[in-house]
Amino acid sequence: MAFNNKKKNANYISAKESRAIARENRKITQEIEKKRNRKHIPEEEYVTKMKNPENCVEFDNVQTYFFTDIGTVKSVDGVSFDVPQGKTVGIVGESGCGKSVTSLSLMQLVQRPSGQTVGGEIRFNTGDHVYNVVNTP
């Protein structure tokens, strides 16, 4: 039986691969931050309407990713649910399934620039206006 030393370890990436991933992820986060940090963002980009006016919060296909030096972590990928006005909602799930990142996305407390809510909508009803938190400056 011959032993093959040249077999790659599937859990290892080279320094060159890591640098390429980091470079690409920096480009992505810089583009998102550039859009987010614009001055005089028109209200049309973040003022919206609730799908159901009886809700105070609506998560619709929310995607929050972390762009690291070794790849992209899709912490929240396609989460959708509603929170009706006057109701208490609990989020239950296994360790590491994205419960905290989902709530941090609503509060705009995801650690930037590596963490970004890149897709979907989080509609928040203040009573006077409805904001899409994902696009709100």
Predicted segment positions?
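ABC transporter nucleotide-binding domains
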Residues: 1-137
